[in-house]
Amino acid sequence: MKIQLVAVGTRMPDWVTTGFKEYQRRFPRDMALELVEIPAGKRGKNADIARILHKEGEQMLAAIPKGNHIVSLDLPGKTWTTPQLATQLSRWQLDGRDVSLLIGGPEGLAPSCKQAASQSWCLSALTLPHPLVRVVVAESLYRAWSVNTNHPYHRE
């Protein structure tokens, strides 16, 4: 199974790239983690945010291969504990499809992305900087994988 993280924003700080790649490399070949970056629309004083969100949404959805299971990362989504995420990861594997996780920009996800998603995951009730979300998602998925494989990374 491949997990595709589709995120708005490019040119992240070095610590984000380093952190994400650290967890990305730990996954086995049969559980690949891929990052697809979508350029953020230009925001300014008079920016049309609805138009920017729409364009970002179109680009995100175009980056997702047909047949992928789509999960939006969104505040109204479900929160999962590590064991619950591990169970979810197992379900995704049994489903036989690759998974695309969507991370929006500063204003969140386009309505089209929310509608395309069959699940919505709330990473935290806290407001997190979008670059940090990439690292937290990668670590959380790795931890869930380690629970499922009895790897010593996760400790109760």
Swiss-Prot record:
InterPro entries: Alpha/beta_knot_MTases, RlmH-like, tRNA_m1G_MTases_N
GO cellular component: cytoplasm
KW S-adenosyl-L-methionine (keyword) present: yes
Its EC number(s): 2.1.1.177
Keywords: Cytoplasm, Methyltransferase, rRNA processing, S-adenosyl-L-methionine, Transferase
Pfam family, one: SPOUT_MTase
CDD domains on file: RlmH-like
Main location: cytoplasm
HAMAP family with a match to the protein in the record: 23SrRNA_methyltr_H
Function: Specifically methylates the pseudouridine at position 1915 (m3Psi1915) in 23S rRNA.
Subunit structure: Homodimer.
Family, as annotated: Belongs to the RNA methyltransferase RlmH family.
Protein name from the UniProt record: Ribosomal RNA large subunit methyltransferase H
Name of the gene encoding the protein in the UniProt record: rlmH
